[in-house]
Amino acid sequence: MAKATAKNSAKQPKYIFITGGVVSSLGKGITSASLALLLKSRGYKVFMQKLDPYLNVDPGTMSPYQHGEVFVTDDGYETDLDLGHYERFAGVQCSKASSYTSGRIYSSVLSKERAGHYLGGTVQVIPHITNEIKDAFRSAAESGADIILCEIGGVAGDIESLPFLEAARQFRFEVGVENTCFIHLTLVPYLKAAGELKTKPSQHSVAELRNIGIFPDILVCRTEMHIPQEHLDKLALFCNVKPECVIEEKDVKDSVYAVPRELSKQELDLRVLEQLHLSVHPIVHSEWDSLVKKATQPKYECTIALVGKYIAIRDAYKSVHEALQHAGMANNAKVNVECIEAEELEKNPKLIKKADGILIPGGFGSRGVNGKCAAIRYARENKVPLLGICLGMQCCVIEFARDVLGWKDANSTEFDENTTHPVIDLMDEQKNVTEKGGTMRLGAYPCKLAKDSNAAKLYKSEKISERHRHRYEFNYNSEFRKELEKAGLKIAGTSPDGKLVEMVELKNHPYFEACQFHPEFKSRPTDPHPLFTGLVKAALEQKKANGKKPTAPSEKTKKTKTK
């Protein structure tokens, strides 16, 4: 055992397991990402994993209404939106090794069984599934990280999460207590009728973990209001956690990017380093504090209309919302995002007229396409700044072909296979694809920008790399392309071989940029994406040009928003 410990201390990375209790959607992703940022700020290299209990191999085929956004990594893996938080907060590069689901784990085990890997043995949850999960934990060590944070989805007590929790329990035993830290995120609700906070749900949640052999080292308590010390002491006593390791995580009012600062005040990172027997290096202050100040005390204000198909759930466009906030910080502005259902816009075009800028995000299927095209036409004709993303770019091409060139039946073959002007068509390599999951054009691809394009000015480069998630592209038919360009639609970016059109723009327009890729996936608070900063800057200028002073929101507005 002593030899194993010595070996671990030399080469073994440290693991932090983050679990959740009482209710779902507590913010494990934000908490995990914030902790990763704090540890990184103290000089440690971090890597992050998300383990989801659902049986889909990945979330790529799931409805946005059920799952929210599908976040795409550079290496082309479709993942949970929490990986977006990891990349935005901690600045880590997530990969396929960052995302595991029960479906992926079971699929791997069953494939091995079919190949005879288990030599006729009876395949069971323990040890085969749990061993596969532990292999997933170990795969993260290839990143070379000092500390690996593993967020386990679901709620303690759910049957779906049990294999992951059991694997984590075994893993601690195998690598040593000094190399692991268990953090349990729980809810301390406030009952208005009783006028008090309740700790009992958290006690029961920890009891669920203890029943399966997991004893949390740190308890992080989500709450609407300050938790009195006597309540924290009570939780420490009944949950068998050191008093200094019961951490309050109160709701932040203005910006989610204030969470790392609040957790730092509670010394969460120090408690973790103590548990992992790691040195407490001086924290390296970055521009994070100034970013939070810009987010909470903006000088200017503008409104961006987001014309989408899935606006009923904000998480469906999570990275888009965040990228707009990053762009707002870069422009010292508060960005009010007005979500407009594309189908409603078809019935009531006036919905968009108060916007200083327009954003058309991605999506699939024909529903709402006419509404998106109506928004694009309004932006084009009235010189309103516009950014189109993925389907948004395709709609920009369709609208231009219909309303400028007069090709009234111009369309995508996704929506109309019989159109005589298929300006958007299925990519050649997609035409023989029959399965849905994981078969799109996914991940980072290089793009060459036209030297004289506005896009090149925004990026300050003619060579870029962006993440994709689509099957359809601008039709490479030379006649279509020639006519569209002749009419004024500039091809601003293509694949390096020039065959795939990745960006289009209008020259005689204050800001009209459309891209086939998803720039929102690469935007960071510390490195906002140029296409979004350009949109917000143009929107502020548009507001000023229209005689509306782009000043900061009034105190009354701020209070209303806070509620």
UniProtKB/Swiss-Prot annotation:
Domain of life (superkingdom): Bacteria
Region (Disordered): 542-563
Activity regulation, free text: Allosterically activated by GTP, when glutamine is the substrate; GTP has no effect on the reaction when ammonia is the substrate. The allosteric effector GTP functions by stabilizing the protein conformation that binds the tetrahedral intermediate(s) formed during glutamine hydrolysis. Inhibited by the product CTP, via allosteric rather than competitive inhibition.
List of residues binding ATP: 25-30, 82, 250-252
Gene Ontology biological process terms, A to Z: 'de novo' CTP biosynthetic process; pyrimidine nucleobase biosynthetic process
Gene Ontology molecular function: ATP binding; CTP synthase activity; glutaminase activity; identical protein binding; metal ion binding
This protein's record includes keyword Cell wall biogenesis/degradation: no
Binding site for Mg(2+): 82, 151
Pathway: Pyrimidine metabolism; CTP biosynthesis via de novo pathway; CTP from UDP: step 2/2
GO cellular component: cytosol
Residues annotated to bind L-glutamine: 65, 363, 391-394, 414, 471
EC number(s) recorded for this UniProt protein: 6.3.4.2
Binding site for UTP: 24, 198-203, 234
Keywords: ATP-binding, Glutamine amidotransferase, Ligase, Magnesium, Metal-binding, Nucleotide-binding, Pyrimidine biosynthesis
Database matches in Pfam families: CTP_synth_N (PF06418), GATase (PF00117)
PROSITE patterns in the record: GATASE_TYPE_1
Region listing for Amidoligase domain, in residue ranges: 1-278
Residues of the active site: 390, 518, 520
Domain Glutamine amidotransferase type-1: 303-545
Note: CTPSs have evolved a hybrid strategy for distinguishing between UTP and CTP. The overlapping regions of the product feedback inhibitory and substrate sites recognize a common feature in both compounds, the triphosphate moiety. To differentiate isosteric substrate and product pyrimidine rings, an additional pocket far from the expected kinase/ligase catalytic site, specifically recognizes the cytosine and ribose portions of the product inhibitor.
Entries under PANTHER family matching the protein: CTP SYNTHASE, CTP SYNTHASE-RELATED
Described purpose of this protein according to its UniProt entry: Catalyzes the ATP-dependent amination of UTP to CTP with either L-glutamine or ammonia as the source of nitrogen. Regulates intracellular CTP levels through interactions with the four ribonucleotide triphosphates.
Name of the featured protein: CTP synthase
Organism listed in the record: Fibrobacter succinogenes (strain ATCC 19169 / S85)
